[in-house]
Structure formats: structure tokens, C-alpha cells
Amino acid sequence: MHYTATVLLAFGMSMDAFAASIGKGATLHKPKFSEALRTGLIFGAVETLTPLIGWGLGILASKFVLEWNHWIAFVLLIFLGGRMIIEGIRGGSDEDETPLRRHSFWLLVTTAIATSLDAMAVGVGLAFLQVNIIATALAIGCATLIMSTLGMMIGRFIGPMLGKRAEILGGVVLIGIGVQILWTHFHG
């Protein structure tokens, strides 16, 4: 695959994580750059691994993976988005749950996995092409690290304007990504 195509693929694959990171950044009270970088590193690491996993699965069982990946992503994103919306509607005081707790490692990993399943599907497709899968996966991971970190910082400025509605908006974004993944699968 040509270098330009790899870069375009990498940034294209990072867009779901970018959108989710904006929502995450908006729900936190002024996240620090270190929190944004942590999010970027988690999203980037997962986004690096999923095309590699997809590539391996593509070699072994491409038909099954391609038939189910969109449903898995859809269910995970609907669940996570619904949870965020419910928490945003319930409200509660900021002391009830610290921003760091709402931004826990496992919640980030789950969100990263849900937004990276399309990269796994791309990895399945790459198994049938002459590509350097390691270089491609690293490019996707680096682009995702950059875009997720940037998304968190953008969310930092949007969050104070939205207040408690930021969590609802973040949930809507995740649900929207899930619907978009399902829509794209059925309507190309």
C-alpha cells in the first residue's frame, strides 16, 4: 500500500476515537493534558492492536469476523452511550463521582475497543493485500493517539459550555457512532 493511502487510512480509522474523545473530554471538568494523553495512548494502543488481530483473524476466519464485527461494535457503543445518557440525566453532585472515576481505565478501554472494531475489519481486509501490516497498524495507532488527545482537549473547551449536558452529548455521540457503523455495514 502506498504511503499516502496508509496515512489516509490511519486518520480515517481514528475518526470514531476522535469523536468519542471529544465526548469524553466534554464530560470531565477541565481535563489536564496528561489525562488527554492517557486517553490518546489507550485509544492508540487499542487501535494499533485491532488491525493486527483482524489481520490474523482474516487469515483464519474472515467470513465470521466480517459478519459479526458491526453488531459487536453497535451493541457496545449503544450500551456505553446509553449509560452516559442515563448518568447525565440523573445528574447528581460532582462529589458523587470524581471525573477520574468516570474516566476509569476500563471504561476507556471498553470505549476504545468499541470504536476500533472497524479497524479490526480493515485488518481482515488487509490480510488479502500485500501490505506491511505492522507499519499500517502503527500508523493507525499513532493517528489515533494524536486525534484522541486532540479530541479530549477540544472536549475540554466544549464541556464547560454544556455543563451536565456534556455527558448526555457524549452518550449521543457514542450511540451515533454505533448507528453509523451498522448503517455503513448495511448500506455500504
UniProtKB/Swiss-Prot annotation:
The keyword GTP-binding does not apply. This is Probable manganese efflux pump MntP. It holds the Pfam family Mntp. Probably functions as a manganese efflux pump. Belongs to the MntP (TC 9.B.29) family. It comes from the Bacteria. GO terms for cellular component: plasma membrane. PANTHER family: MANGANESE EFFLUX PUMP MNTP-RELATED (PTHR35529:SF1). Keywords: Cell inner membrane, Cell membrane, Ion transport, Manganese, Membrane, Transmembrane, Transmembrane helix, Transport. It is found in: Cell inner membrane. It is a multi-pass membrane protein. HAMAP family: MntP_pump. The chain crosses the membrane at residues 3-23, 41-61, 66-86, 106-128, 143-163, 168-188. One of its GO terms (molecular function) is manganese ion transmembrane transporter activity.
